[in-house]
Amino acid sequence: MVKMVETAPTRRGLLKTAGALAGAMVVPDAVSAAMRATEQVPLPSSRLAPVRPAPRVEPRSSRVVKPELMRQALAALEQHGSAIKLRDRMVIADFAASSSQPRFHFIDLVSGTSVSKLVAHGSGSDPGHTGYLQRFSNRDGSNASCEGAFLASDYYVGKHGKSQRLIGLDPTNNNALSRAIVVHGAWYSNPDMIRTHGRLGRSQGCFAVGERELAEVFDRLGQGRMIYAAKI
């Protein structure tokens, strides 16, 4: 049978316990004293340098686009500045070139670099299907491409799959939204059309790009940037 033995606290143990409690009480007093000392130290007055506005970056031209077409596009960017929120990049559709040529130019206005893609024009702009745009039209039902500055707007899914709405900013294309002139992918804008037929197919006025190119086109264009379409 185990006998429980109770031991009375020794004098040495009591002294150790009292010392520990006294030390714990000293810590808050030391912290308070340190805080009071810090509060009494005068801090130097802070004089922040005035914030300068970010310098305006002059857009750099692309060597791929004709100088006159580039000048027109930059002028349109300035003219519609309040509507176009993003001005680091823009897209130029050079409809003087054949549809067999990469003529949809994505231009970085900071670096001056560019990436070019194939893009179809409207059947009403090229009735004979020559591969060259003959005329523009803003008329509903014309199935023609229209010229001028467009604002890249929101995305939606329609009969051509994922598409991006465009808002026409000029009198020559201000029916673009009601005509459903959009950016979308299409089989007739794939590169194999050029190998087979020597030119792309035609849209109903939309900027139709290759199906495999669509994701990159959306990524580079984004929302709030400008497309400028012209023939010079």
Give the role of each language-model region:
Residues Q204-I232:
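N-terminal targeting pre-sequences for secretion and organelle import
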Residues Q40-S203, R212-A215, D219:
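Cell wall/extracellular polymer interaction/catalysis modules
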Residues T10, M25-V27, S45-S46:
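NTP/phosphate- and nucleic-acid-binding module
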Residues L21-A24, P28, S61:
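Cysteine-nucleophile amide-bond enzymes
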Residues A24, A149, C206:
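Gly/Ser/Thr-rich helix-start
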Residues A30-P42:
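Signal peptide processing junction and immediate N-terminal pro/mature segment
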Residues V2-A22:
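N-terminal secretory signal peptides and thylakoid transit peptides that target proteins
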